[in-house]
């Protein structure tokens, strides 16, 4: 029995109690929101990860870290170093490998990860078909489904399943005046398969069987947005919205079968449209968790897309997004290095917390208040220990040597906090004030 079925039957499980303790909300609210599909536990029940990762309504915003080889760069040691970064900064991890021995790479990443691991199974079967049959779109429906099952058996906790795109939507998008017709790699693979085989989406045709597989492992279906906007000028056009409407129907059927499901979102969205993008998705899908790639509010930010997208991510988090998929400085330019993965993950950790301060209020702001208290006291040791990256903070604090006064090297003897503390002492010792 899956966690949704348990919740619907009124059962309070150890996992629900753990979520309640982790997030600081009553266990009955956890159970109720799981029963409604508004909280998901990202896991593969047969191969639990070392970290408990719930996402959903009134929970802290989580961060996903993408890693993986490419056809141009296959360096497993580098990818395993990225896993270590993800373990430190992230909540979930996706293996998006497209080069090398994909089965071996996936299994090594799962073994090294403390986090629930996700994949995009169509990548593997498309690449295998391309190598064996001289065409990526030559795979059969059974081969695709067998790949999904193989990933589940390996312990994958969530998968991007591009089931929302229809053949009609794909053809019309490719013929349209969109700036970029399709930017989703997996979405383009499914679109190519439908056109090559003159057939409907293989996930949609076999949807009941897909649900059965995920139900067996109580893993999470992440409904991919194949037609997400890859340019801000394409945001919220008929193709993005058309796919979202199809996705909403699939969400309903998944929840009816007791299958955990979340929805993926854009992408590239102007700043003023981000909040209502979240509200629209939540309205159409009944409030299931939303997993968003930023979004990027501009298209000109590379090689600083981790910064540009963190701006959008903070707004989306504040508006109700549950899981943020990070971007790195290499986005739109190439495969990221280990350092770039870390830079992206830290930017998104900051964005997630900024959103939580709005979304969760005082509960999230307690951390900030504590840091500010120590900052006001010039208690550098305690303040630095509470910061998001204490090691880096200490390096900056001492980069010109240990300050000669209690203040830092920016203000030195003219530090307002130092002067304020001195004035407080004078006020306290004076009988005339």
Curated annotation (Swiss-Prot):
Family statement drawn from the similarity comment of this UniProt entry: Belongs to the ThiC family.
GO biological process assignments: thiamine biosynthetic process; thiamine diphosphate biosynthetic process
Organism classification: Archaea, Thermoproteota, Thermoprotei, Sulfolobales, Sulfolobaceae
Name of a matching Pfam family: ThiC_Rad_SAM
GO MF terms, alphabetically ordered: 4 iron, 4 sulfur cluster binding; carbon-carbon lyase activity; zinc ion binding
UniProt protein name: Phosphomethylpyrimidine synthase
Cofactor: [4Fe-4S] cluster
Binding site for substrate: 66, 94, 123, 162, 184-186, 225-228, 264, 291
Positions bound to Zn(2+): 268, 332
